[in-house]
Amino acid sequence: MATSYVKESELLSFFVYDTRLGLKEGTEEQKILYYHPDNESVNKKVRNVGLCEALVNFTKTFNPDRPCQAVHTDRKRQVFLEPEPEIWTVMTVSIPWVEQVNNGERTVQYIQDYVQDEVLETALQRSYSMFKLFHGSYTDVCNQAGQEGLRARLQRFYSRYLQTIDVDKLDIFSIFQGMQFLPLDKYMYLKAHCFVNLVETTYRNIQRTVFLYGDQLVW
């Protein structure tokens, strides 16, 4: 009898590093501005960041304007973004897989096509845009609060923001960064309409109104 098990795609790591820091041997950890998961050993963090920096530097020899954007392996996908000069953000996700057991024999098939580079790149860009919306650019924060201040804000923001990213549910619609309408029956839609009209009538200084429920658009 055959049985199967599906493992969904997951966020494995997310980090921000500055290539201008930690240039001396033994100070490489200073490059890291933020790293998730935080419980990784320092050696592993430094090794992963160093590998990414080496990949970027190597690919710059072929295309200086657009160096390494994504790395594919059988089990992982890694995407790169340079939102500001010399500051890189890297996200690594697992490739979903299906395990089948038939007559005691176990086979695992990784579904590469399920993970799209463009979708992950959009998610990475959005993560930076959201930080910039609330705090300003990395450079501005660093100029105002210093490197440790930047690290603290990155930690505070991304430790919460990354919890909202469901990698397995990212799809082509994520690229357009749109918003879904909340389906309502006529009665509930009319109540929402009346509520918005009441608010706008009561507070005359309101010029535009957006009514959200969760992450869906009502009005």
Report the location of each language-model feature:
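Intrinsically disordered, Ser/Thr-rich regulatory regions of eukaryotic membrane-trafficking proteins
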Residues: M1-W219
